[in-house]
Amino acid sequence: MTTYKDAGVNIEEGYKAVNLIKNIAKETFDSNVITDIGSFGSMYLLNIENSDYILVSGTDGVGTKLKIAFYMDKHDTVGIDCVAMCVNDILCHGAKPLFFLDYIACGKLKSEKVATIVKGVAEGCKIAGCSLVGGETAEMPGFYREEEYDLAGFAVGLVKKDLAICGQDVKEGDILIGLASNGVHSNGYSLVRKVFGIDENPKVLTKVYEELNLSLGEELLKPTRIYVKPVLKVLEKIKIKGIAHITGGGFFENIPRAFPKGFVAVIEKGTWNILPIFRLIQKYSKVDDNEMFSTFNMGIGMVLIVSKDDVETAMEILNEEGINSYVIGTIEKGEGGVVLR
């Protein structure tokens, strides 16, 4: 069995680092900071006369998915991933993204490659309905290899104070709606690379596995789905009580961030189609379901928490917007966390 920790990613150490950072960051907070460190997005009250809006910001990167782009020399979609990771996070608080900035650091600046990357960023911004207003490109020889780069971004959005989503209205009996993912998205790639031996043999990315209808590399580079416009459409019609973006830490880490203490999310396995890529990863890694659900999105890229009466309306809108959705579980009273059944 090959776990995420075996691949070099220690999630527990990450949690420890966040807890240490929290206290440092809190020393800088003023009275306009609404959310604690660890929320999907950071909420800041616009404390100006006659304003009832909150700024919501988020920052993230593409992670080691970039290694796949390096090996395949394909750089046109990782920019979409970068935007998705940021705007999907601030969407969890009901915010409409306003603008985006990117940061590219590379070993050797190659203008055409950078332009290709940024074209993907711009495409992501178009999908999300926000503006790419600036960024930074840093050439750092001796720090990165010549053919390698890192890509991160920063998004800012806006939500009316009385419409901000923080999970405060979640109650027992509420329903969890899962929104279909487009594949692995942008998390779990350290484990993926280890499981398939990609770093030792990059040519494996050209292999077409029986479970997939395209090469492994093409499957792994599918861009992260951006949920902004479909979810904002749902918000026009119903109240969404909580939203979770399923990223690093999978179901177990992210779904509990969408509701307060005293509840547990009960997930019914088998209520949606787990994508073939995840079956393939599990086959080769030999890890159990809990490890898979704590590492990957398993075919669900975002989870909405709504009242029973609003489920049908929400799913109809999502279907109209081209997003497959599933009732995947319920909210029950409990000690917190996620239970898989």
From Swiss-Prot:
The keyword Cytoplasm applies. It catalyses: 2-formamido-N(1)-(5-O-phospho-beta-D-ribosyl)acetamidine + ATP = 5-amino-1-(5-phospho-beta-D-ribosyl)imidazole + ADP + phosphate + H(+). Its EC number is 6.3.3.1. Gene3D superfamilies: PurM-like C-terminal domain, PurM-like, N-terminal domain. The keyword Nucleotide-binding applies. It comes from the Bacteria. Pathway: Purine metabolism; IMP biosynthesis via de novo pathway; 5-amino-1-(5-phospho-D-ribosyl)imidazole from N(2)-formyl-N(1)-(5-phospho-D-ribosyl)glycinamide: step 2/2. One of its GO terms (biological process) is adenine biosynthetic process. GO terms for cellular component: cytosol. One of its GO terms (molecular function) is ATP binding. SUPFAM superfamilies: PurM C-terminal domain-like, PurM N-terminal domain-like. It is found in: Cytoplasm. Keywords: ATP-binding, Cytoplasm, Ligase, Nucleotide-binding, Purine biosynthesis. InterPro entries: PurM-like_C_dom, PurM-like_C_sf, PurM-like_N, PurM-like_N_sf, PurM_cligase. Belongs to the AIR synthase family. This is Phosphoribosylformylglycinamidine cyclo-ligase. It comes from Caldicellulosiruptor saccharolyticus (strain ATCC 43494 / DSM 8903 / Tp8T 6331).
